[in-house]
């Protein structure tokens, strides 16, 4: 069975409600919304939302702010947040534009990254889950293969690394961890900044954060961190507190 909840001829108010919920704005609009048998399990239903754009729209590409007419389109699908207990997918024709140099580029859509397979809202849920559980557990929780979860995680970690700034770090903690044998990693964290309040009590005014993680537990691990620390505007001379368990490799560093 196929249940049509909304089509181009449906009540505008119904369409507006779903557009607001999804954050869809002109020139994008919801073309159809239906419940269909799941592609993974035909005995279950899933929601399919088709989004389209107004014909004749020019789309912006790049930082210049210039807009270009649509060259062609490619159909893409993203998994969205569940609609109650039903899986929800968004499908859209994604425009490509031809630049003055002849290159054809895919424009960004407001609800998802190109090549992700998940909407930005769904990626937010994934990132929240992996903060509290293993990736394999998170994958089972949402019913996806863990390789998809790893791709989302790796992308956002790389983006976060680009924004690292160690200029305010004046305390560092070092520790090593192992998993299943002697496969060690070394973790470097910042100490929280502590101030003395008006009543003479010590109070933390910042939270500790992970600065760097690397394989091994030797002098080379510390040297790799030091290189990254300087690269991200860290000043070794400004570090007045450093703590570690003082294993041999760390003492040598």
Could you say what each language-model-derived stretch is?
Residues 150-241, 248-253:
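RNase H-like nuclease fold core
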Residues 48-50, 98, 173, 187, ...:
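Structured core elements
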Residues 1-3, 63, 71-172, 176-183, ...:
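Short, positively charged, Gly/Tyr-enriched micro-motifs
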Residues 13-17, 125, 148, 221-224:
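Exposed alpha-helical structural elements
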